[in-house]
């Protein structure tokens, strides 16, 4: 999996940062997919500067209904249709997302020529496609807001082909069945259990993408043990009280959560427009003083998970 940040500014865009949107390229060899997390104004413009196009999108996850995470959605949906794209699209989001989308399309005389499903979510598991699952966790913000935990299912371990050949199993289709953990019957009547020839499963990757939030009870469960945690760092330590009063977090709070949750890497985003490049580096240093494995997301930065 890889993350591509399309927008990293909090509240309003700046000359170098658009408002929030994050692409997740699933990069699966047999089931490709491109997911979008939040869709602030101008997201479709940002998408034009990447190697991806809206036709590749199959799922959009909205954290909450504040404009800097949402106002780019109607335009993206319409442009996707006007480009002749017919692949289905599913939108997940809190209560009100359906009304927002349907109202925007209706009053502008717009529509989609592709199947569009809108799923209004609550806390809990919202998706399992057989390869990965997505769970929504409630956050602390003035509007109903969620963070998303994306977990790949464990992958089967490597098949011991050498041992199978020694046991008289010919390479070919039977190996595929054994790789799936099935039991096969050879021509001589012997039964071979694939599980006996598989190494330990390979743990899947886990990723936590937070919406806007102040410190909250669900944060630790959302982030616990993930490989990568994406979290806002709207304001610096000296402005922590102001951040919390508006349902946001400081650098210290983001980094402390990453340390307590035992994550592999913290990526900070959603930085206030008050910070220029020098100020953003200061935010990064504050986080690294608590959790060294911290990176700062800029627009179009790509991170592997």
Curated annotation (Swiss-Prot):
Any GO BP annotation: tRNA processing
Chain's gene name: rbn
EC number, UniProt record: 3.1.-.-
Organism this protein belongs to: Escherichia coli (strain K12)
Family: Belongs to the RNase Z family. RNase BN subfamily.
Details of cofactor binding: Binds 2 Zn(2+) ions.
Modes of activity regulation: Activated by cobalt and manganese. Strongly inhibited by the presence of a 3'-CCA sequence or a 3'-phosphoryl group.
Annotated keywords: Endonuclease, Exonuclease, Hydrolase, Metal-binding, Nuclease, tRNA processing, Zinc
HAMAP family linked: RNase_Z_BN
SUPFAM superfamilies: Metallo-hydrolase/oxidoreductase
UniProt subunit comment: Homodimer.
Top EC class, one word: hydrolase
Record-listed Zn(2+) 1 binding positions: 64, 66, 141, 212
Disulfide bonds: none
GO molecular function, one term: RNA exonuclease activity
Effect of gene knockout: Mutants are unaffected in growth.
Keyword Nuclease: yes
Residues that bind Zn(2+) 2: 68-69, 212, 270
Annotated SMART domains: Lactamase_B
Name of the protein described by the UniProt record: Ribonuclease BN
Cofactor(s) listed: Zn(2+)
Active site: 68
Domain of life the protein comes from: Bacteria
Job description of the protein: Zinc phosphodiesterase, which has both exoribonuclease and endoribonuclease activities, depending on the nature of the substrate and of the added divalent cation, and on its 3'-terminal structure. Can process the 3' termini of both CCA-less and CCA-containing tRNA precursors. CCA-less tRNAs are cleaved endonucleolytically after the discriminator base, whereas residues following the CCA sequence can be removed exonucleolytically or endonucleolytically in CCA-containing molecules. Does not remove the CCA sequence. May also be involved in the degradation of mRNAs.
């Amino acid at each position: 999996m890889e993350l591509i940040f399309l927008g990293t500014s909090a509240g309003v865009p700046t000359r170098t940062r658009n408002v929030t949107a994050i692409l997740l390229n699933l990069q699966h060899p047999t089931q490709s997919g491109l997911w979008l997390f939040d869709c602030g104004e101008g997201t479709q413009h940002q998408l034009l500067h990447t190697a991806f196009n809206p036709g590749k999108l199959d799922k959009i996850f909205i954290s909450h209904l504040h404009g800097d995470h949402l106002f780019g959605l109607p335009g993206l949906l319409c442009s996707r249709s006007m480009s002749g794209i017919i692949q289905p699209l599913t939108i997940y989001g809190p209560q009100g997302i359906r009304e927002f989308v349907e109202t925007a399309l209706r009053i502008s005389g717009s529509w989609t020529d592709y199947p569009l499903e809108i799923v209004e979510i609550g806390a809990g598991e919202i998706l399992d496609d057989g390869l990965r699952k997505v769970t929504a966790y409630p956050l602390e913000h003035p509007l109903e807001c969620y963070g998303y935990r994306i977990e790949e299912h464990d992958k089967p371990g490597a098949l011991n082909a050498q041992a199978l050949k020694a046991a008289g199993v010919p390479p070919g289709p039977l190996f595929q069945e054994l790789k799936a953990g099935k039991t096969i019957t050879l021509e001589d009547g012997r039964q071979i259990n694939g599980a006996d020839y598989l190494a330990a499963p390979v743990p899947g990757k886990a990723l936590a993408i937070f919406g806007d939030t102040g410190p909250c009870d669900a944060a630790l469960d959302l982030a616990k043990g993930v490989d990568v945690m994406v979290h806002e760092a709207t304001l610096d330590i000296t402005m922590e009280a102001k951040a919390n009063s508006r349902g946001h977090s400081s650098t210290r709070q983001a980094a402390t959560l990453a340390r307590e949750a035992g994550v592999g890497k913290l990526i900070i985003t959603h930085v206030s427009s008050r910070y220029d490049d020098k100020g953003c580096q200061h935010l990064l240093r504050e986080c690294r003083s608590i959790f060294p494995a911290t990176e700062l997301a800029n627009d179009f930065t790509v991170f592997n998970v």
